[in-house]
Amino acid sequence: MAPTAASIDEYISTFPEATQEILQELRRRVHAALPDAEERISYQIPTFAVDGQYVIYIAGWKHHVSIYPIPGGDGELDADLEPYLSGQGTIKLPLKQPVPWDLVDRAIAARVAERVPQIRR
């Protein structure tokens, strides 16, 4: 993982170009699902928040990128995510494989649908 960065741009810039492209696309897709997301670094990784409370995190690593947390409880989504799950609610996307963007979008949408109502009640 990259050292603590002051911004998401700075964080992403510490990775190789191919990883930067994936992280930027993840960032774009989070904003597409959550247009009013606030960006910050929390726990040394990019964090997207609403009303000051986290919704979703992304992170870059040497061999993969991660998205977390991902909710469970949707049988079809859970089954589709199973090959990418690592630990409780973490998706690991290996850098040597094509990113399953449709699945990523579904996972992000599920997290937004779960978390935002909790924040805004």
Annotate the PLM regions:
Residues 1-121:
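Charge-dense, helix-prone N-terminal extensions
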